[in-house]
């Protein structure tokens, strides 16, 4: 039995949409909750890896959610611009809200790194799907 990737995504689109909203809220909660006694500034620390990982997951989730609700592929512009604007928006909110958090350029850099890693994974998954469809159509 062969599984159609797009059919599977569209069949579970309500669940996928819910997971996307949950992922978005977790990122907002994690980045906007009141700050703790973490070290002020280090280039490579746990916080930066969390930023990269969260934005990698969020970009991948954006692409999959887009496919669940739109029959065509997500535009690369959407998969690049939306996460980057989300990350910059979070940093602006950290500077405005009274959460004892402060905006950092390095957070934006690691958000962008995670965005591009998520984009690469999304494109790789699409390529694998396209190749398997080509093989299926040849036989």
Identify the function of each model-found stretch.
Residues 1-106, 112-139:
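Bulky hydrophobic segments
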